[in-house]
Structures are given as structure tokens and as C-alpha cells.
């Protein structure tokens, strides 16, 4: 499945919630009628079956993290293989992606922009350039901006935006040095309560 390149607001309206795909700190429901699906006049939402609800939740989370269908299924398989709660494991694997960590640290305004920084070799992990967005960051890893990329206006603008967001407790960021430490894996309570990962587990368990 190809990566979606269309309007970001349309995806959030499709899922009925802000997927944080835009760079602004203002919630997008102040800009558009997020409760209405995309399309002329916003088509009325059909009543979903249990399967439909599970599928929508999976699509919502997959789009939020910018992961393709095959990748997402592989993350689920890995989460099911690990000890502990499968749903929580899945979210930790997604949160541990390098592009997501770059976003959480405030170096990129969105996960999409953070993915670009990674692919353009602007990001280092423990002093070495890593250009794979899906690279799994481990506790105590140091993630930083390459020296020649520190002058990029988009990085500086992203750090300014990040000052207005709630700072993740599992990260430690030095904005002046443009580097941060992935202190630990986030607990479930650290992450959005708007995600119902048990629905995804139910979907894939069938």
C-alpha cells in the first residue's frame, strides 16, 4: 500500500479525531468540522459493526504514526510475541520508532517532517547517522541533530512549537544542543487515552 500524500485534515476528519498530522499546536477542530467525514457537505457517518469499529481504530493509530499496513501488521506480530500486554507492547514499538522519537523531542513539527529529517540524514543516534525511520530507539540512546542540519529554519521553528506542547516524561531534551535522551519506554498511562488499543488486538486476533 502506497503512503498517503493527500490533505492531512481529510485523514483526521475520516477518523473523527485529531491525528496530529499538522504542525500547529492549535487543535484542528478549531479549523474544520472534524466530526464530519470528508466529502461534499460531510456525508453522514454510517453505524459501524464491531468489526468496523475495530478497523477504524486500527486505521486511526496507523495513520497517526504514519505506518504502512504491512509494517503495522508486523508491529502487531512482534507485540504479540513479546511478554506482557500486547496492546501496550504495540504502542511502545510505535513510540520507539526513530521518526516518532524525533517528533516527540520536538526536532520535527510533525511525524512526517521528522521522517524527512531522518531520511535526509539529519539525525544521529549515539553519534552515528541513522536514516531509517523505523529504527527502534532503545533506553538511554542519545538522539541528536547533525551539526550541518542545526541551522535549518524548520528545526528551529519545530523546537519553538515544542515549547508549547506537553513535554514527554520519558524523554530528556536539551533544546540548545538539539539533542535528547530516550530515558525509558513510555508507560501506557503516558500515552493518549484516545487510543483504544484493545480494539486493534481484537481485530488481529480473529
UniProtKB/Swiss-Prot annotation:
GO terms for molecular function: rRNA binding; structural constituent of ribosome. It comes from the Bacteria. Keywords: Ribonucleoprotein, Ribosomal protein, RNA-binding, rRNA-binding. The keyword RNA-binding applies. Gene3D superfamilies: Ribosomal Protein S4 Delta 41, Chain A, domain 1, RNA-binding S4 domain. InterPro entries: Ribosomal_uS4 (IPR022801), Ribosomal_uS4_bac-type (IPR005709), Ribosomal_uS4_CS (IPR018079), Ribosomal_uS4_N (IPR001912), S4_RNA-bd (IPR002942), S4_RNA-bd_sf (IPR036986). It holds the Pfam family S4. Residues 96-156 form the S4 RNA-binding domain. GO terms for biological process: ribosomal small subunit biogenesis; translation. Belongs to the universal ribosomal protein uS4 family. HAMAP family: Ribosomal_uS4_B. Part of the 30S ribosomal subunit. Contacts protein S5. The interaction surface between S4 and S5 is involved in control of translational fidelity. One of the primary rRNA binding proteins, it binds directly to 16S rRNA where it nucleates assembly of the body of the 30S subunit. With S5 and S12 plays an important role in translational accuracy. This is Small ribosomal subunit protein uS4. The gene is rpsD.
